[in-house]
Amino acid sequence: MKTLLLDAHSICYRAKYSPLVGLRVGNQFTGIMYGFFRELHVLLKLFTPDRIVFTWDSKGSLRKKLFPTYKENRYTRIQTAEEIAFDEACSKQFVMLRDEVIPRIGFNNNYKFEGYEADDLIASIVQNNLGDFVIASSDMDLYQLLSDRISMYLLSTKKRYTERHFIDEYEILPKQWVRVKSLAGCSSDNVGGIPHVGNKTACKFLTNRLNTESKAYHAIISNRGKSIARRNYDLVCLPFKGTPVIKLGTDALSISELKLVFLDYNFRSLLKPDVFNEIQRLLRGGSYYGEKQSGCGKSVKT
């Protein structure tokens, strides 16, 4: 069985900065939801999965208990009133998709757990379920999960990324990536690394190719360097400690409900006969398909 694992939060976030984000029906903004379903159509065509799983970040993070400044650099200046209003309008669409629209259609593998991030849930899923997985995300932390049955589709480059691609690029095994990030840190999450050490330098250290006279080498083997690496390991290793074990269930997809969603939000391009028929055909090809009664979807699993 081939499962498409969506970092749904990441897909929505990318749609937030698309030219179509301002779409609306009445007073309801719909651009993020439209962008989400358009991306889903693309992914269905690319991978023809048997099953689709949606994973979401929670608002808070348990990692902050280990590292209080975790992800605190997301805003480097005070937001304007317009920017705050825009963020709030976008957040409403995230929640509507997660809690109402996706369950309404009958996708039952839809997960959010308080304190955990989408990549934690993705890691739990691939570790506790059989089959092949394609992870749709741009989160480089997920590289540590790559294997002969787990690949990625990088949303940022729109390219497939496999275990072989990773080994060719970094000259280490995917399971060593967590050690790389422990040494180098992650600037996007405000997790500082060891001074003078980036991803490539960390890879050289792990494969004994780093000059033992270099500043980076001595920084890594110093007491401070070892302390930073120990702290970072728990932050970057997936899944984070305590992440629930997730066993995937069965969907009960309703094509009629999907069509009603597209009608309700005026997603006209997705309702064109050739487009909608293709979406319907691709979804019906999955083992999750089973026509359910309207309105019987389950809410997000938390």
Predicted regions and their residues:
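Conserved RecA-like ASCE P-loop NTPase motor core of nucleic-acid helicases/translocases
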Residues: 135-139
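Noncatalytic, basic helical substrate-engagement surface that gates or grips nucleic-acid strands
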Residues: 2-132, 142-160, 237-253
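Hydrophobic/aromatic side chains embedded in well-ordered alpha-helices
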Residues: 1, 133, 189-192
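Non-catalytic nucleic-acid-binding/docking modules located in mid-to-C-terminal regions
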Residues: 42, 46-56, 71-77, 82-85, ...
